[in-house]
Amino acid sequence: MKKMSREAFILGQRREELNMTQKQIAAEIGISLQQYQRFEYGYRDVSAASAKLVLRICAALELDPYELIFENGIDLAGKNTQE
């Protein structure tokens, strides 16, 4: 069994916080349910997706793209925020 990635965990947790189904998120993003599930189950890395798709995912889930992609986030100077 594949270990859940940090990104996948964040997606699932945030979706549940918003009380939305995977199908609702997929529809809002404009992708199929199966495509979204690949991200949330960790079979596809969000960071490997196009920037446009990452931004749509983050908008639907009300997430900061930097917090999703970069483990420690980044500040405006481009440095890790937890250094």
Predicted regions and their residues:
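Alpha-helical residues within the helix-turn-helix
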Residues: 16, 27, 59
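Short alpha-helical DNA-recognition segment
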Residues: 19-41
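Short, charged recognition helix plus adjacent turn
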Residues: 59, 67-83
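A short, Lys/Arg-rich alpha-helix, primarily the initiator
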Residues: 1-17
